[in-house]
Amino acid sequence: MGVDIRHNKDRKVHRKEPKSQDIYLRLLVKLYRFLARRSNAPFNRVVLRRLFMSRTNRPPIAVSRLIRKMKLPGRENKIAVVVGTVTDDVRIQDIPKLKICALRVTDGARRRILKAGGQVMTFDQLALASPKGQGTVLLSGPRKAREVYRHFGKAPGTPHSHTKPYVRSKGRKFERARGRRASCGYKN
């Protein structure tokens, strides 16, 4: 007699609306749902899907990365579109003239972009300026830059593992003996 397969965890999660109750986000969803339905542009469908995403899947993007991505050939005079936050980067001295559209822009980043003669748009302004996403470049931040990703992967302590262990402290007495030195058992 076989054991029945458990079906309790085999659903594919597919968001149909954002989890957030933010009314302004909901208005954007309403707008882009209309655009995605009425225009056959894949840009609007992608923006709509990204508006549904959780905060961890909408990582912030720094101004420095934005500049680097917009310097690539064929991207001059285009609008950089970020479904997320644009943050400032103090390591960059001079910012070129940028035209960006984002959900949020930090005060420092906004000040520096506007000072350089750039423009900061909201998504409803973008819908009027570029309803089919023409003349835009969709960008996103690095998802795996979060500190938590350092703890994922092969178990810490196994050979060739660079995974960060969850330890209380980095002192002499914490995860420094067995497995780390030949005199205590073995060395990986």
Swiss-Prot record:
Lineage here is: Eukaryota, Metazoa, Chordata, Craniata, Vertebrata
Function, in words: Component of the large ribosomal subunit. The ribosome is a large ribonucleoprotein complex responsible for the synthesis of proteins in the cell.
Disordered: annotated segments: 153-188
The highest taxon in the source lineage is Eukaryota
Which residues belong to the signal peptide in this entry?
none
UniProt record, GO biological process: cytoplasmic translation; erythrocyte maturation
Subunit composition? Component of the large ribosomal subunit.
The record's Gene Ontology cellular component field reads:
cytosolic large ribosomal subunit; rough endoplasmic reticulum
Keyword Nuclease listed: no
Localization terms from the record: Cytoplasm, Cytosol; Cytoplasm; Rough endoplasmic reticulum
Name the UniProt key words of this record, in alphabetical order: Cytoplasm, Endoplasmic reticulum, Ribonucleoprotein, Ribosomal protein
> Which protein, by its recorded name, is this?
Large ribosomal subunit protein eL18
Q: Which protein family is named in the record?
A: Belongs to the eukaryotic ribosomal protein eL18 family.
Cross-referenced InterPro entries, in alphabetical order?
Ribosomal_eL18, Ribosomal_eL18/eL18-A/B/_CS, Ribosomal_uL15/eL18, Ribosomal_uL15/eL18_sf
> Where along the chain is composition biased (Basic residues)?
161-171
Q: Which Gene3D superfamilies match?
A: 3.100.10.10
Q: Which GO terms describe its molecular function?
A: RNA binding; structural constituent of ribosome
